[in-house]
Amino acid sequence: MKALLAEATWTPKKQNLNKNLGVVGSLAWKDPQFKIVDKSFPVLRHDEVLVRVKYCGVCGSDIHVYETDKQGYILFSGPTKLPVVLGHELSGEIVEVGNEVKGFCQGDIITTESILWCGHCTACRTGMPNQCENVGLLGLTVDGGFAEYITLKAKYCWKLNHLQERYSFEEVCKIGTLIEPIGCAYNGIFISGNGFLPGAFAIVYGVGAIGLGAVMLLKAAGAAIVIAVDSIE
C-alpha cells in the first residue's frame, strides 16, 4: 500500500546526550525527508480494527516534522520515533475487526484519538490519559493515517455512524478529521481551563483549525462575545 513516510537522521544534540531526552524530536532528529513509499499491508491484532483511511488532515505537528531550525533539526518538540508514517487527524471505514473487539463492525465510520494512552499508569487511572507516562503519539511515534490502510486499537476509536442521519458518507468522513483538533480546543477550554460562566467574554489567539474550533465551542457554550486574533502575513 502507498504511504507518506517521514525520515530523518538521528543526531542527538551534544548538550542533551545525558538528559534522557533523545525521544524529543527537536533535540534528536536532523535533516528530515518525506517520501511516498510502498509499505506492507498492516497485520491485524486481536484488539485492533483495520481501517480504510478516507481522509487525514495536515496538522501543524506534521509541518513541524518537515520544518527545521538553523542547524537542520526538526521543529516538532514532542515524542518522535522516525521513520514513521505521519498523520493523526484521520477518519475512515472499518474493513475488518480483531477477534476480541466488541462494539465495532465492518462498515463502521470511525475517527481515532491521537494520544495513545496505556490505561495502566497513575495518570491514566486518575482520568488524565493525555498525561500518560507511557504515551504514544499516532503518526509521530507509531505509523499514522497518511496511508491507504491503518490498524488501530479499538479502545482509541470512536464511531461516527449516527452522523449519517444528517450527512452523507463523504461529509461524515470530512467531519471526522476535525474531531481531533476541536477536541484539543475542548480540552483547553473545559478540562484544563475549567470552563467559563455563560455570558463571559472570550479571546482566542490564533484561528487555525484548533482556534476556529475554540470559537465554535465558546459560542455554543454561551460566551457573550468571542474575539479572535491572528497575525497577517
Predicted regions span which residues?
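Charged, glycine/proline-rich intrinsically disordered loops and linkers
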Residues: 7-35, 71-77, 166-170
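Hydrophobic/small residue at the entry helix of a nucleotide-binding pocket
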Residues: 184, 210, 218
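Short Gly/aromatic-enriched secondary-structure transition segments
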Residues: 65-71
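Glycine-rich beta-strand-centered segment in the early N-terminal region that forms part
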Residues: 33, 40-57, 71-122, 164
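Short structural boundary motif marking the start of a folded domain
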Residues: 1-4
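Adenosine-nucleotide cofactor-binding segment
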Residues: 168-169, 198, 204-207, 215, ...
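NAD(P)H dinucleotide-binding glycine-rich loop of Rossmann-like/cofactor-binding domains
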Residues: 77-83, 88, 118-201, 205
